[in-house]
């Protein structure tokens, strides 16, 4: 890794709640390199239109859709939109694509199989190659992945992965190694649900809206996340509370702080006092992470952004990657 990991704030704010350009400029002023725009047409403004607004109207070094749903949008249209944005804002377009489980679910469509999704990734990659084989978004196109098969397939198809595997150090280490097992130059970013709280007792209510979607990932690959039978049962209890119609926003999960909620929170979220956020960020980025995409869906993220930005920047600055991590 030749430079410190980059920091992007993912803007996942419901219709009418906040202007993405205003939030983007604020995030950049606090030290983020740019922003991602969530793709959920029933809940949030269109990520492509807002990406253009942010790129044209702010000083963000990087901006674009995170995560664009290939389960709803055809890869050919996604490629066309990315090429257009890149033509207007060369070197600044950043994009993450995925199956888009929540948006697909909300539209009543089937979630693409891994084979179908991998074909879509390859189509997207091919559509973004110039005639001489040059990629239009070198190092700036990633595929979201949580489980081991998806991580491997995405690294092979795109050469870039946004890991959504939580914050447990052992799991992240395995995921980074897997992403680079066949392609050592794979760009590896980590999706982090983080928030600074002054009192550890505030962690439970602050984290509640995102627990259900995290639990669903754990349930889908229990061995990968190191769950025993009892832990799997607890994770299932949390997963069924998740409301996909409110995915990524406040009240997506009922505010219940039980053993299952604590398990998911400890494995998947980084909601803690600033010193703890800094320490754990340093450990995570020291594994060879190229960048962090910070979830913006928690209600307290925006008002708490200055403290969060400071803690993350301190953690990234103190990351000391080893040769083995890259």
Residue ranges and their predicted role:
Residues 43-53, 114-115, 165-182, 300-306:
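Active-site-adjacent beta->alpha loops and helix N-cap segments on the catalytic face
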Residues 2, 24-29, 51-62, 82-93, ...:
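Acidic (Asp/Glu)-rich catalytic clusters
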Residues 2, 6-14, 72-134, 165-176, ...:
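Flexible, glycine-rich active-site loops centered on histidine and acidic residues
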Residues 15-27, 77-81, 144-153, 206-211, ...:
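Short, acidic/polar
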Residues 108-132, 181-283, 320-325:
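An alpha-helical appendage that flanks or caps ligand/catalytic pockets
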Residues 5-11, 35-37, 62-68, 93-97, ...:
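Hydrophobic faces of well-ordered beta-strands that scaffold small-molecule active sites
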Residues 2-3, 45-68, 72, 117-130, ...:
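Alpha-helix-loop-beta-strand connector modules within alpha/beta enzyme cores
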Residues 1-62, 66, 325:
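N-terminal beta1-alpha1-beta2 module of alpha/beta enzyme domains
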């Amino acid at each position: 890794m030749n430079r410190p990991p980059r920091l992007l704030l993912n803007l996942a704010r419901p219709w009418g709640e906040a202007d993405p350009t205003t939030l983007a400029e604020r995030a950049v002023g606090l030290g983020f390199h740019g922003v991602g725009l969530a793709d959920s047409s029933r809940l949030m403004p269109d990520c492509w239109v807002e990406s253009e607004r942010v790129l044209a109207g702010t000083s963000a070094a990087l901006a674009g859709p995170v995560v664009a749903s290939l389960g709803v949008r055809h890869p050919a249209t996604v490629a066309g939109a990315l090429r257009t944005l890149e033509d207007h804002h060369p070197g600044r377009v950043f994009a993450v694509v995925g199956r888009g489980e929540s948006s697909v679910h909300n539209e009543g469509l089937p979630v693409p199989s891994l084979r179908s999704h991998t074909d879509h990734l390859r189509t997207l990659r091919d559509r973004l190659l110039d005639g001489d084989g040059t990629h239009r978004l070198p190092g700036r196109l990633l595929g979201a992945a949580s489980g081991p098969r998806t991580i491997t397939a995405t690294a092979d198809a795109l050469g870039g992965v946004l890991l959504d595997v939580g914050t447990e150090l052992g799991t992240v280490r395995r995921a980074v190694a897997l992403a680079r097992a066949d392609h050592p130059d794979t760009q590896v970013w980590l999706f982090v649900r983080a928030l600074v709280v002054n009192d550890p007792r505030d962690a439970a209510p602050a984290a509640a809206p995102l627990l259900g979607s995290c639990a669903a990932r754990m349930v889908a690959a229990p061995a990968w996340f190191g769950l025993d039978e009892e832990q799997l049962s607890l994770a299932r209890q949390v997963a069924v509370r998740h409301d996909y119609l409110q995915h990524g926003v406040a009240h997506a999960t009922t505010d219940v702080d039980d053993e299952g909620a604590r398990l998911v929170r400890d494995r998947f979220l980084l909601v803690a006092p600033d010193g703890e956020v800094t320490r754990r960020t340093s450990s995570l980025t020291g594994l060879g992470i190229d960048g962090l995409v910070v979830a913006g869906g928690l209600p307290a993220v925006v008002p708490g952004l200055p403290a969060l930005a400071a803690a993350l920047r301190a953690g990234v600055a103190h990351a000391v990657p080893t040769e083995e991590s890259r």
